[in-house]
């Protein structure tokens, strides 16, 4: 039986791609860690958890420059990341913009 592959526009997939970009960025990575109170090991351990993805999208929604830079880096529009935040947010306890 073939398993369904997640769509590249799936909100969790977009959030994971954004997280990978932010974590690897010299400016955004440390700032995100400082705001969440996590260290790099904790982030690695919690990377796929809904609350971590929501925290990352909340972080990006609060900083337009980082939102635009991240969207460009992962090949999506800022609006697609905002939509991912809206889709993950209400169901998982995040913001509903």
Which ranges hold each PLM region?
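Metal- and O2-centered redox machinery and metal/ROS homeostasis
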Residues: 1-97
